[in-house]
């Protein structure tokens, strides 16, 4: 399996009592109808670590139904130990997802040997296609490229790696060393176009929640060799990504993330995102006003 294109890491709307599954269905339907190559609801953007295992399964059941074979359905484990990870992979397999993204161990900063041992224990019990993942903003460490290389060489079910490090030198290493064997996928919207130009296969991104077909257009332009046009579109969106970064997305995970993505989705599409799931705080009024200003300047609202 070769993963290519734009996979939407979707936001999760809530009610005061739980997940707003009807709202989720609307979000997923818009993305599938727009022509995105895949959906990834139980993601960091989708607040996977704040969902119960039962909620994660139901979210993926909705995604599987909405996708209807028109888009890949990818599930994220959101777990930090091998036993819980194996359990979530089993549950997702029963749902019939296409690919599972393995959340790396978090809370403790692990060394190479511990990370490698974690992957071996999980993959020895896993036969579904798997994406490996690095997100040092959440785990406190970046997974060495060599660890991914070792794991990919040992386990044929590993089909890709998602990079949310924000470290472009590291990303280039992934493309150079693993790009012939695995699909290298960018995890930050701000770096999507530069990554594609340098040989990445696609991205797992939050922008599709509220950007319409813009992210797909970026992908198309690069693939057609229209690099200057892709860069121009990228630069047009930079005020948005710089604002998102300034509010905690890049550099550290601030308390305003991913609520800004949810607010943007609500402002653009009119879908009630409901309250953030605690302990995430609501977006402050000053940030809401700034986001509204940027979205208006982009012609999105």
From Swiss-Prot:
It comes from Pyrobaculum arsenaticum (strain DSM 13514 / JCM 11321 / PZ6). The gene is dapAL. This is Uncharacterized DapA-like lyase Pars_0992. It is found in: Cytoplasm. Its main location: cytoplasm. Homotetramer. Keywords: Cytoplasm, Lyase, Schiff base. It holds the Pfam family DHDPS. The active site is at residues 44, 107, 133, 162. One of its GO terms (molecular function) is 4-hydroxy-tetrahydrodipicolinate synthase activity.
């Amino acid at each position: 399996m070769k993963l290519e294109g734009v996979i939407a890491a979707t936001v999760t709307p809530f009610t005061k009592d739980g997940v707003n599954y009807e709202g989720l269905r609307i979000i997923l339907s818009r993305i599938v109808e727009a022509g995105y190559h895949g959906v990834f609801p139980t993601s960091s953007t989708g607040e996977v670590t704040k969902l119960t295992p039962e909620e994660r399964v139901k979210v993926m059941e909705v995604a599987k139904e909405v996708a209807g074979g028109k888009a890949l359905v990818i599930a994220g484990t959101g777990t930090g130990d091998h036993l819980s990870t194996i359990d979530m992979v089993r549950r997702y397999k029963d749902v019939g997802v296409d690919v599972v993204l393995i959340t790396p161990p978090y809370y403790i900063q692990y060394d190479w040997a511990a990370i490698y041992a974690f992957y071996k224990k999980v993959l020895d019990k896993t036969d579904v296609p798997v994406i490996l993942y690095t997100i040092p903003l959440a785990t406190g460490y970046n997974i060495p490229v060599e660890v991914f290389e070792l794991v990919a060489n040992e386990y044929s079910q590993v089909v890709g790696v998602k990079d949310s490090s924000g470290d472009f030198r590291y990303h280039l290493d992934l493309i150079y060393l693993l790009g012939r064997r695995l699909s290298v996928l960018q995890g930050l919207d701000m770096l999507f176009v530069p990554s594609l130009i340098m040989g990445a296969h696609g991205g797992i991104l939050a922008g599709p929640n509220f950007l319409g077909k813009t992210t797909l257009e970026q992908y198309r332009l690069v693939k057609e060799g229209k690099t200057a046009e892709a860069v121009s579109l990228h630069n047009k969106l930079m005020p948005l990504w710089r604002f998102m970064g300034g509010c905690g997305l890049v550099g550290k995970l601030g308390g305003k993330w991913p609520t800004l993505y949810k607010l943007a989705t609500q402002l653009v599409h009119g879908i009630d995102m409901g309250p953030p799931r605690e302990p995430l705080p609501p977006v402050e009024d000053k940030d809401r006003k700034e986001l509204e200003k940027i979205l208006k300047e982009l012609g999105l609202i």
